[in-house]
Swiss-Prot record:
Record EC number: 2.7.7.105
Record keywords, A-Z: GTP-binding, Nucleotide-binding, Nucleotidyltransferase, Transferase
Name under which the protein is recorded: Phosphoenolpyruvate guanylyltransferase
Principal EC category: transferase
NCBIfam families per record: F420_cofC
Family that this chain belongs to: Belongs to the CofC family.
Gene Ontology biological process terms from the UniProt entry: F420-0 metabolic process
Organism, scientific name: Conexibacter woesei (strain DSM 14684 / CCUG 47730 / CIP 108061 / JCM 11494 / NBRC 100937 / ID131577)
Gene name of the record: fbiD
Length: 223
């Protein structure tokens, strides 16, 4: 079994616009970069992941990917998460992947042990999908596909239920796996507050994001 992780990453410039009410453009960019590096760090430490593909149009993100032994793939069209993932799936198959794990670049609390448990769990079906919901149980923060092209991704509002329906239509065995370290992605001020609380409650993990938030707190206590 050869497992590739697929990681679509938006440009850092103008990133996390929904946080603009509380964070200026510079800190938002720094936060996006820090979270991305933490995700790459976790994936590099995950034994069950053989290769990581990063889909991005951001030159800086491409350079960082190379530094973490990931394969950067240019995403010049920037046509959205679904098309980026599909392009990643096609490239993964060309390189011999037998399954893919699609993740998000803004889930900095990713725990390699959680990912290895997910990937190493015995399954009776040869064709399956495992959906990891976001913390609200509505979106999709993780999508494990075997085979990689078993179904087309359909990210967006209420994607968890939609992915389940699409998998069933495709004849795939479906599993919903609630994994706290994968469930928290950061898009809104509430998400950022939840991340701060989670980081404060744990000693390890998300080193780059933790450092960035601590620096932000020192320079601007209101944030």
């Amino acid at each position: 079994m050869s497992t590739f992780a697929i990681l679509p990453v938006k440009r850092f410039e103008g990133a996390k616009g929904r946080l603009a009410g509380g964070l200026a453009a510079g800190p938002r960019r720094a936060l996006a970069e820090a979270m991305y590096v933490d995700v790459l760090t976790a994936l590099r430490r995950t034994q069950g992941v053989d290769r990581v593909l990063v889909l991005t149009a951001d030159p800086g993100a491409q350079r960082v990917a190379e530094g973490y032994d990931a394969i950067p793939l240019d995403d010049p069209a920037e046509a959205g998460q679904n098309r980026a993932v599909m392009r990643g799936v096609a490239h993964a198959r060309e390189l011999g992947a037998t399954r893919v794990l699609c993740l998000s670049g803004d889930t900095p609390m990713l725990d390699p042990a959680d990912l290895d448990a997910l990937l190493g769990r015995p399954r009776t079906a040869d064709r399956y999908v495992v959906i990891v919901p976001d913390r609200h149980g509505e979106g999709t923060n993780g999508l494990l596909l075997c085979p990689p092209d078993g179904m087309k991704p359909s990210y967006g509002v209420d994607s968890c239920a939609r992915h389940k329906a699409l998998a069933e239509e495709a004849g795939l065995a479906v599993e919903i796996a609630e994994i706290p370290s994968v469930a928290l992605d950061v898009d809104t001020p509430d998400d950022l507050d939840a991340l701060r609380e989670l980081i404060a409650s744990r000693r390890g993990g998300a080193a780059h994001t933790r450092g960035m938030l601590n620096q932000l707190l020192r320079t601007n206590p209101k944030n």
